[in-house]
From Swiss-Prot:
Protein name according to UniProt: tRNA N6-adenosine threonylcarbamoyltransferase
Biological process, per Gene Ontology: tRNA threonylcarbamoyladenosine modification
Enzyme's top EC category: transferase
Similarity remark: Belongs to the KAE1 / TsaD family.
Gene designation: tsaD
């Protein structure tokens, strides 16, 4: 089955052609550079640019896959969660294409896409632990099947990648913050600043994460530099922030490994490409897997891949399905299933 996957939940305009859920025939992504000067994604600009480029991105995906549009068997599109304007552009385009080509439509949860992405290139048996690290999500889950996912922990405030972006913005390190902080940290002292590590000891929160305290402490350090008329040491700030940001992850992961006795961990999302994080994870007594870099960040291939499996099991989505910027809160509580 040939599936066109469309992903437009944030600022990346993505489309891919995937055969039978795993064979990637094309994977096109157009990143919007217009947001860099704002040090963050501007929703209105993102949706306008999606409107401008989504057709050409899909056309390129079809051309690169060396197929004709009529050969598409299924259209999969991200419908939630994300920026509502961006989601609407993607889902409305997918609906129009579905009607024009007379092909079924399947609406996909963006998080399910990230959880499935590593399985397109990695052979691993269920169950296993999954960690999603991105600008919008920080989620630790136990996967029993592609559609049977138990949320163990999640961020209670800022996502990991979001904290990177906000710190980078205040220190004018550039956008996106993740790769810029990682680069600066290589020349810094990671123990120059003792930023707080937030760990929850209550049973119901033992796998949860928090980044608001770390982010605030890091930003307040900038004010201390100014008050004392000291030089701002971006390299040391980046190194210290990065160290603590990932130490915040390690303890909940260790707890999950011990409590579930599962020794397999998949890490996906844009932050998963950070090499410092990968070195820290090596110290855990667990088999660790990462998708290729192009599948770590937002992409259409993961939407097409999981769309194929969801369609085979559940059938097509109603054409009336709307975009939804958020998932219901219960989806993120301990023990909930996506």
């Amino acid at each position: 089955m040939i599936v066109l996957g469309i992903e437009s939940s944030c600022d990346d305009c993505c489309a891919a052609i995937v055969e039978d859920g795993v064979k990637i025939l094309s994977n096109i992504k157009l990143s919007q550079k217009e947001h860099k000067k704002y040090y963050g994604v501007v929703p209105e600009i993102a949706s306008r640019l999606h409107t401008e480029f989504i057709m050409s991105v899909c056309q390129k995906a079809i051309t690169n896959a060396q197929i004709h549009a009529s050969e598409i068997d299924l259209i999969a599109v991200t419908s939630k969660p994300g920026l509502i304007g961006s989601l609407i552009v993607g889902i409305n385009f997918a609906k129009g294409l579905s009607i024009a080509l007379k092909k079924p439509l399947i609406c996909i949860d963006h998080i399910l896409g990230h959880l499935y992405a590593p399985l397109m290139t990695i052979k691993i048996e269920y169950p296993f632990l999954s960690l999603i690290l991105s600008g919008g999500h920080t989620i630790l889950a136990k996967q029993n099947d592609f559609d049977d996912i138990e949320i163990l922990g999640r961020t209670l405030d800022d996502a990991c990648g979001e904290a990177f972006d906000k710190v980078a913005k205040h220190y004018k390190m550039g956008f996106p913050g993740g790769p810029n902080i990682e680069k600066l940290a290589k020349c810094g002292n990671q123990y120059a600043f003792n930023f707080p590590i937030t760990i929850f000891d209550k049973k119901e929160n033992r796998y949860d994460f928090s980044y608001s305290g770390l982010k605030t402490a890091c930003i307040h350090q900038l004010e201390k530099f100014k008050d004392k008329n000291e030089n701002i040491t971006n390299n040391n700030i980046a190194a210290s922030f990065q160290r603590v940001a990932f130490e915040n992850l390690i303890i909940p992961i260790k707890r999950a490994i011990k409590d579930t006795n599962i020794k397999k961990l998949i890490i996906s999302g844009g932050v998963a490409s950070n090499l410092y994080l990968r070195e820290k994870i090596k110290n855990l007594e667990v088999e660790t897997y990462y998708p290729p870099i192009d599948l770590c960040t937002d992409n259409g291939a993961m939407i097409a891949g999981i769309g194929y499996l969801m369609y085979l099991k559940y059938g097509a989505s109603p054409i009336e399905t709307d975009a939804n910027s958020r998932i219901e809160n219960y989806k993120y509580t301990k023990g909930a299933k996506l």
